[in-house]
From Swiss-Prot:
This is Small ribosomal subunit protein bS16. HAMAP family: Ribosomal_bS16. GO terms for molecular function: structural constituent of ribosome. The keyword Ribonucleoprotein applies. It comes from Rhizobium meliloti (strain 1021).
Amino acid sequence: MALKIRLARGGSKKRPYYQIVVADARSPRDGRFLEKLGSWNPMLAKDDEKRIELNAERVQHWIAQGAQPTDRVMRFLDQAGLAKRPARNNPTKAQPGKKAQERAAEAKQKAEEAAAAASEAAAE
């Protein structure tokens, strides 16, 4: 049985509240779980101590049993010092293509030349 430490959504519409639970990976998001490990209330201020509550001892127990935390829960565990979050791969997909980069460099160069010409004209 593959175990996950994940968030189960509660609360009402537009007022989210999450329980941090250990559940079988195949069970529904808000379905049956084995144990509640804590809670996360995203409506509270980021510096509020009750925003994220974790039972550190039980979290360590379930990780030792092989439970895999999800990305968001891993962030919480990293903040609490219970686990180390690995560095993420940051692909360069968001960069423009070669032609667009060349055009941007040319435009920047023209702007610099125009600024230099304007400063020379103002100096005379």
